Amino acid sequence: MSEKRQFLKEFNTLDYILRSAKNILIVAHSNPDPDAVGSTVALGSFVKKFYKARIVMGCYDPFPDTLSDIIPDVTFENPDELDLTLFDVVIGCDSVERGFDRVIDNVSEDCVTIAIDHHHDITLQSDVRIIDGLYAATCEILYDFFIFTHKQFDKKIATALLVGIIGDTGAFQHANTSAEILTMSADLIKRGASITKIIATLSASQEIETLNLWGRALGRTKFYKENGLAVSAITREDLQGHLVNSGEISNVASMLATVPLVRAALVVYQADDNTIKGSLRAEKHGNIDVSAIAHTLGGGGHKLASGFSIPGQIIGVDDNGWKIV
């Protein structure tokens, strides 16, 4: 079984860069989810506390109001309104291909670019890459970095990290919840993070549009008893007026994978007019390596969580079913 990378060399490099930097921009992906918010705020707060650089936290969308009670007094600056050439370091945290790509196209030539992510399919190039799909959340990677530096971080940083971890593990219900995650979360609670307040806030923050999207996907799910596969589809019509977050799609697959008799779940969605993306999820008891399925379709990932992208369209979504052409 594959093991997570330790990133000792990369952490040394990151620490050196942070100590040398003067102006740092940390970027959360568009339509930021809890892991994007948590990782951006945690790293920004950590640098402010322990390094000398000026910090700006950026995102093409505003800081989510739903998280302002547990992560107060934070503002995201729109990168379009910043002079990006003033930054000597820019860092993308989580789903870096959803916004960070636009930033690094407009920085100065000598700017150092850093990508920190736990998504397996990141192709974006940067000067420093701290990316491993075996981590449950980008906040988990940052926790390891903070521990690596031997700096004693506070309640605010611990809270931001736990927000991301709880968000991407589905409050410890998804298959990516490991013993390491639970030990890490216990440490964050010791540092002052309130697990009950975070879970209550995240549970209450699901938008009606998101719940409706999940409902449509769950309503057209098909179960293939012969192999234990649950399959569903999300169309362009489903997504009209809804800025899709890939995490929302993954959450549908994760929920389906927990249903009794389901060994693995696949949710496909129309990413654009001619591209279909798929999210594969499994639980350990299913004994299915979904990365093998993803690899046959040109994708990747790991045993319990993988994804792929293929050309095509989802058509005929009605009572008679749907198909990909």
What are these regions (language model features)?
Residues 1-13, 106-111, 133-142:
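An acidic intrinsically disordered interaction segment
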Residues 2-31, 36-68, 83-87, 167-296, ...:
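Hydrophobic helix-and-loop "lid/oligomerization" segment in the mid-to-C-terminal part
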Residues 43-44, 107-110, 131-132, 183:
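Glycine-rich, phosphate-binding/catalytic loops in enzymes
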Residues 56-58, 91, 112-116, 128-131, ...:
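Hydrophobic/aromatic beta-strand patches that form the interior of the parallel beta-sheet core
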Residues 116-184:
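Short alpha-helices
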